Amino acid sequence: MALSITRGLLLLAALCCLAPISLAGVLQGHAVQETDDTSHQEAACHKIAPNLANFAFSIYHHLAHQSNTSNIFFSPVSIASAFAMLSLGAKGNTHTEILKGLGFNLTELAEAEIHKGFQHLLHTLNQPNHQLQLTTGNGLFINESAKLVDTFLEDVKNLYHSEAFSINFRDAEEAKKKINDYVEKGSHGKIVELVKVLDPNTVFALVNYISFKGKWEKPFEMKHTTERDFHVDEQTTVKVPMMNRLGMFDLHYCDKLASWVLLLDYVGNVTACFILPDLGKLQQLEDKLNNELLAKFLEKKYASSANLHLPKLSISETYDLKSVLGDVGITEVFSDRADLSGITKEQPLKVSKALHKAALTIDEKGTEAVGSTFLEAIPMSLPPDVEFNRPFLCILYDRNTKSPLFVGKVVNPTQA
């Protein structure tokens, strides 16, 4: 007799919707308690930060090898936290694959410490800050007739700050609307229509989103934005609005990467790292860039004068994570061999779909903030022109948690 496999849905929106596991046993049936000790929280999330960075580069390399003509933009924090939450309900090899694929070695870091790290990471990112808007959220949509394991529900709520909603997946259109409305609201309207089609046999959907809006510490002036050429490749050139500012920047040239490295701070704790390779050196940059180099860029401060040109852009990318995560060894959870018995005992589960959508907007202000004028003293010698007028990399990094929030490559700024 054929085994009946019920579907779980995983959606990520710089954002992710997924199916979770039960690690309640490892955590002794109780979620890690919240703490007001900021230094303790930082220490917990710092333990998983190197793993998140390595995971980010693993995903980036997979996407880059798939296509060198497309924009790339994703949130490693969103994807990793969603699948770590899924691991709370996974058993056996399914459980092992997920944590190993995320870059964790349980002989080096106990599983309870991994989940505590994510708990404190999400808690820290969600701290109110009037200077920037950085929010993350997890929503668990459960079919009205489904009975989920209590310890799983407890752990996803306490560890991953997940909200739980009862929903009728048989009414696929209404269920789709509720999930999309939840994501759109949580992402401040930046991520819409994440779910295009919803299988009525779905038992649960786990949605994770992360949304960021930041103000540049030193905004660009709109009057200096002009239309200029952006060279997509040797045959293709497009016109883009190019922001411009003459001043002092955290900017240096990296011989190893044959690239300019620019760090622009947002008001608050987020830094944008832009990496512009020399002509014909994009492959060299992608092959050699790693967590260790990124850490060095973020640690050392440079002060260089430059005439900077940076394109205004608004891009979004959507990924089916089944193939992406297969490249890092996470496969069983999508197959009929999946063991997600920590989520429900009633029937076998597998993740039928894992979607991730991320959106990026770069403009003069960074957000709706009122622009300001900055006056800076620069050397009398003519500063170099550094113009991001060809494909470049972009990494948004949270200094509090030492985590890469978003990673991307801009190949064509006009591709929405």
Curated annotation (Swiss-Prot):
Glycans are attached at residues 68, 105, 143, 269. Its main location: secreted. Residues 371-390 are annotated as: RCL. It is found in: Secreted. The keyword NAD does not apply. Keywords: Glycoprotein, Phosphoprotein, Protease inhibitor, Secreted, Serine protease inhibitor, Signal. Plasma. The keyword Secreted applies. GO terms for molecular function: identical protein binding; protease binding; serine-type endopeptidase inhibitor activity. The record marks 380-381 as: Reactive bond. One of its GO terms (cellular component) is extracellular space. Gene3D superfamilies: Alpha-1-antitrypsin, domain 1, Antithrombin, subunit I, domain 2, Serpins superfamily. Pfam families: Serpin. The reactive center loop (RCL) extends out from the body of the protein and directs binding to the target protease. The protease cleaves the serpin at the reactive site within the RCL, establishing a covalent linkage between the carboxyl group of the serpin reactive site and the serine hydroxyl of the protease. The resulting inactive serpin-protease complex is highly stable. Interacts with CELA2A. Interacts with ERGIC3 and LMAN1/ERGIC53. Interacts with PRSS1/Trypsin. This is Alpha-1-antiproteinase.
